[in-house]
Amino acid sequence: MTDERPGMTRRFEDGVAILSFNRPEKHNAGAGDPEAWEWALRAPEVRCVIVRGEGKSFHSGRDTTLLGTRESDESDYEFVRRAVISRINSLLYAKPVIAAVKGYAIGGGFEMCLSADFRVGSTDAKLCLAEVKYGILPDTGGTQMLTTLIGPARTKYMTLTGDYLDGKTAYEWGVFDFLEEPENVDAKALEIARTIAARSPAAVEMGKQLVDQMYLGQVINGVRQELLAQSSLFQTEDYKEQRAALREKREPVFKRR
């Protein structure tokens, strides 16, 4: 079964749901489909989920041309809260998720990668928590999930600099669980997913939940703190100055307020 939609295609085979972000001309920026995610995580016939990107990249985060735009009656808090609720819900589902990561995984795209149970990465991957470059911070679990994988110091480095992490270093640091050449990433992810899908679904889901309970509560509490921090940053003069500087192609002049 294959279902193609503008933001995400979905395919089902051998008990595996394969969700593909489908905006390759923009490195999949802003791509996604909540209904596809809901189906994959709830449908009883789905035993394991793969999330990947069409084209050269996994997902390059929010479309930066739309930053700061939203429904006129929506508060900054509610704007971030919608994304936070979606992330928390995805973390609480019992089905295993594998991220097959090629090319760019930036900002929210990187956070989607981090929320998976396993990450198969490519040697050409470029990972980045880019939010600080826009005067804001990760708001869907980036600081929390990355810390569980690579520790506080390296997470602070990525959060505070916005620098890129290449695929080899991501594997060495523990962001990627498997490292493949770009042409082999999807096949490796499917191999793992088929193996999991062939196991007892009750045992698989319970096993995932047993491991998750060791740290997931702390991560979710941290994600809620990200929500408060981000909605506060949206109100600062420095955030507005950063956006203006990007538009005007100049260095920002921050006032620390």
Give residue ranges: language-model regions:
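Terminal peptide-recognition signature
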Residues: 19, 23, 33, 51, ...
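Hydrophobic helix-cap positions at the C-terminus of alpha-helices
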Residues: 39-43, 196, 233
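An acidic, glycine-rich surface segment that forms the CoA-thioester-binding/catalytic face
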Residues: 34, 38-45, 64-102, 149
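Crotonase-fold acyl-CoA enzyme core
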Residues: 89-202, 228, 235-236, 241-244, ...
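Conserved CoA-thioester-binding segment of acyl-CoA-metabolizing enzymes
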Residues: 1-54
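Short, charged, surface-exposed hinge/linker loops at domain edges
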Residues: 208-217
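Short, active-site-adjacent cap segments at secondary-structure transitions
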Residues: 56-60, 106-107
